[in-house]
Amino acid sequence: MTIIGSMRRIDDTRGAVRVEDLYDTDIEDLWRACTEPERLARWIGEVAGDLRPGGIVRSSWTSGWSGPARIDACEPPRHLRLTSDPGTDGETQIEAWLTPEGERTRLVVEERGLPVAELPAHGAGWQAHLEDLARSLVGLPSLWEDRWNELIAAYQDADVA
């Protein structure tokens, strides 16, 4: 099982998951897939609300997570940073960077502030989401749950740096 993510400790109790993949589309199209509600619904879930820096959105993801997120930075078409569950003990930062590589685009997503014990579940989840993003670009449906179930053991066996 190939994993495209890594996990690392930030401190004794919190950590980060980082996943990246290369997509057969240009940076503008991938940016739209990562920021437009109708495109997000095809691969990660429903998002609605104030879609501007400082705005709060409500999300309901295919992974089962549901809650608010604040848009902290939005620099089209290269960088997006959100704080999920802002102001709570479950607060995390989700950051995405897009980089063109020829006619393709690399997407790197990092979520920071996760409980260390939950890193494997989030690593498998983010990989399944990024694979669903690739599927959505060619009109295929999400396979999130099946892929998460296939990936979780590999992430549980992976080292946390």
Q: How does the language model describe each region?
A:
Residues 41, 45-53, 58-115:
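Hydrophobic-ligand binding "helix-grip"
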Residues 25, 89, 117-120:
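Residues at secondary-structure transition points
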Residues 24, 37, 50-51, 65, ...:
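Alpha-helix N-cap/helix-start and coil->helix boundary motif
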Residues 1-11, 102-106, 111-161:
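Terminal "cap-and-tail" regions of soluble proteins that handle hydrophobic small molecules
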Residues 1-47:
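Hydrophobic ligand-binding cavity/cleft-lining segments
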